[in-house]
Regions:
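Active-site neighborhood of HAD-like aspartate-dependent phosphohydrolases
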Residues: 2-59
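C-terminal cap/substrate-recognition subdomain and adjoining C-terminal extension
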Residues: 2-9, 88-91, 95-224
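Short N-terminal signal/transit or membrane-insertion segments
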Residues: 2-8, 48-50, 62-79, 213
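Amphipathic alpha-helical interaction elements
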Residues: 19, 75-78, 132, 136
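Electropositive phosphate-/nucleotide-binding environments in soluble metabolic enzymes
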Residues: 21, 64, 80, 166-170
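A general structural signal for well-ordered alpha-helical segments in protein cores
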Residues: 24-25, 71, 170
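Short linear elements at protein peripheries
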Residues: 29-30, 56-112, 116-118
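Short, mixed-charge, low-aromatic patches
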Residues: 42-49, 60-69, 84-89, 125-133, ...
Length: 224
């Protein structure tokens, strides 16, 4: 009898897990820096900077920690930009910013699971417009992420549907988990609801062990 390895459902967070940084706002800023000829974009960027300086977002986040208002306001800067340009910049963002900043030990795990034939998902609050290029490059067929809203080929400056964060991640992936062996890789404590749902939670930590992961006795991948 030939032993066949068991196929698993494997979930990878994106920001801080596969990529070394938080990617959503940075994508918008990558675009804004290349849209400097637009007075409207420059004016919106000025407003965001002033709100940061006055700590408006920080204060609001203390009251409404799950709203992520700053992320929504940052995305507002893109209102009116064509889909074609957003997509062109997303590909450039992947090539220039994401690919050089992958977390190598986690990407190695990703490749291993794909080679094993496991069903791999990228589940992220990052934006689909650039995650699709990462997924295509590494051969990941299934992604669930926050989406930028477009209408008639123009960015609306807001998200389409729910932001794929915290409990929303669980809602997205739960239908795929029943009766399957499951693994999840993430760096963030905000993903605790997801980690508690899977059979094998793995926390990705930068430089040193994270206390919350230790407290839950989770396996860790520590990279530097």
């Amino acid at each position: 009898m030939i032993f066949m390895p068991t196929k698993k459902i494997v979930i990878f967070d994106f920001c801080g897990t596969l990529i070394t940084f938080q990617t959503a706002d940075r994508y918008v800023m990558f675009c804004v820096e290349r849209l400097h000829d637009s007075k409207v974009v420059r004016w919106r960027h000025f407003i965001i900077r002033m709100m940061d300086k006055l700590r408006v977002f920080k204060i609001y986040n203390l009251i409404h920690p799950d709203n992520n208002w700053r992320k929504r306001m940052v995305l507002w800067q893109m209102k009116g930009v064509s889909y074609d340009l957003c997509d062109k910049l997303a590909k450039k963002y992947f090539e220039e910013e994401l690919l050089p900043n992958v977390v190598q030990p986690v990407v190695k795990k990703l490749k291993g699971h794909l080679a094993n034939g496991d069903r791999v998902f990228i589940l992220s609050g990052g934006y689909d417009i650039y995650i699709k290029y990462f997924a295509k490059y590494f051969g990941v067929k299934e992604t669930m992420s926050s989406k930028i809203a477009f209408q008639d080929g123009v960015c609306l400056g807001k998200m389409s549907g729910k932001d794929c964060m915290r409990e929303n991640k669980v809602e997205c992936i739960r239908p795929y988990l029943d009766g399957e062996d499951t693994i999840c890789y993430t760096d963030s404590q905000s993903d605790l609801p997801l980690l508690k749902l899977v059979d094998e939670p793995v926390v990705v930590s930068h430089d040193s062990s994270q206390h919350w992961a230790e407290n839950h006795k989770y396996k860790q991948i520590i990279w530097n």
